[in-house]
Amino acid sequence: RLTAACDKLAKAPIYVDDTGSITMMEIRSKARRLKQKHPDLGLIIVDYLQLMTSGVSAENRVQEVSQISRSLKVLARDLDVPIIALSQLSRAVEQRHDKRPILSDLRESGSLEQDADIVVFIYRDEYYEAESDQQGLAEVHVAKHRNGPTDTVKLSFLRRYAKFADLAAA
């Protein structure tokens, strides 16, 4: 099964660019070339936003992250391709008793919250509390959904595989 899965992945149209300190201009250029070459491009993932630079002068890092956020939104519209942009959280979450992330915890910019159509957080109590009675459980919280409802879904977290599964299936 492992060989079959590896073979399937090897043949999948997945393109990885692990360029360090990439600028927004470089991402835009590479994404446009990829879209021209593969018109059915289905998704772009940025891991993670704070590792990027805007390539444009900004007064501070908050403004720079705001420029990156807006530029990714424009790129998604221009290419008609969804973009998932991962983001760090601020340290504020560590200072609260309830460690579940909230929108204001998005690091270095309120514009991330503003620009995003959907914001999803993952929370695992056992990450913060070793003796938690929530071992093997995760919460996926849709904190913002511009065109739909927000809610929290509980999933099973299979640490051994770094995999999430329906509670009923686990």
Predicted segment positions?
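Cytosolic-facing regulatory segments adjacent to core modules
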Residues: 1-40, 54, 153-156
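Hydrophobic "anchor" residues on beta-strands that sit immediately upstream
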Residues: 42-43, 113
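Conserved Walker B
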Residues: 49
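Catalytic P-loop NTPase motifs of RecA-like helicase/translocase cores
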Residues: 52-53, 69
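Conserved ATPase-coupling elements of RecA-like P-loop NTPase cores
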Residues: 53-60
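Phosphate-binding/switch region of NTP-binding enzymes
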Residues: 63-165, 170
